[in-house]
Regions:
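Transmembrane alpha-helix boundary and packing residues in multipass membrane permease domains
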Residues: 4, 8, 19-20, 56, ...
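Helix-terminus/linker motif at the lipid-water interface of multi-pass membrane proteins
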Residues: 9, 13-31, 99-106, 162-173
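Short alpha-helical transmembrane segments in multi-pass integral membrane proteins
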Residues: 1-4, 58-124, 170-194
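Small-residue-rich hydrophobic transmembrane alpha-helices
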Residues: 32-89, 93, 126-145
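Residue-level signal for short hydrophobic patches within transmembrane helices
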Residues: 1-13, 17, 39-46, 83, ...
Length: 194
């Protein structure tokens, strides 16, 4: 169960790391990152859970010895992940409307929108990773999935430090740097798994 927990919680861990670094950067940034991260995660999860369901079918077809069907259902999960991008982008105004309804201070809301927008732009990477991960976990090959997600989280820590505070040759970008770091790090696991 541990590899599955690691794989499904990778984005949560990355957003938590964002908040750890942002807490040392600005009180406004830390106030903005949590609600924006949770809201984006809520929208992304519909697509991620659906694409990740490919792993269930991979397990069934793997048990039946039908490798071709394993590849086919994984491909469907990948297509769904890619198709989620325009929907996630279309949900950005709805997210902004919800943030306005909540009524946080204007400076917090401005940073919430920055973080939320980046999470939504890169949101398709989460279902992409879950679909690819489902191919391996459905065949009880969880080691690669686990290591890929750990690598993604490690990349996020380094990029958060560099992009939030302006270290390692990067400009100081605050909350936007944290969001960009998480989007980049979200691409690591799928790239390793491919």
């Amino acid at each position: 169960a541990t590899p599955l927990i690691i794989g499904s919680s990778a984005l949560t861990v990355m957003q938590f790391c964002d908040r750890l670094f942002l807490a040392r950067h600005s009180s406004v940034s830390i106030q903005a990152a949590l609600p924006a991260g949770i809201l984006s995660f809520t929208f992304i999860c519909l697509f991620a859970a659906t694409a990740g369901y490919a792993g269930t079918f991979v397990a069934q077809y793997h048990g039946a010895g039908d490798r071709r069907q394993c590849i086919r259902v994984t491909a469907q999960g990948l297509w769904l992940a890619l198709a989620s991008l325009p929907f996630l982008l279309l949900l950005i105004p709805a997210g902004h409307a919800l943030m306005t309804l909540i009524g946080h201070a204007p400076e917090v809301m401005a940073e919430e929108r920055i973080y939320f927008d980046w999470m939504m732009r890169g949101g398709f990477l989460v279902p992409l990773g879950w679909a690819i991960g489902g191919f391996f976990t459905g065949q009880s090959r969880m080691r690669l999935n686990t290591l890929a997600n750990i690598a993604g989280a490690a990349v996020n820590v380094v990029l958060d430090y560099a992009m939030i505070f302006g270290r390692l040759g990067c400009p100081a970008m605050g909350i936007e740097g944290g969001a960009i770091a998480t989007v980049i790090a979200s691409a690591v696991a799928p790239l390793i798994q491919i």
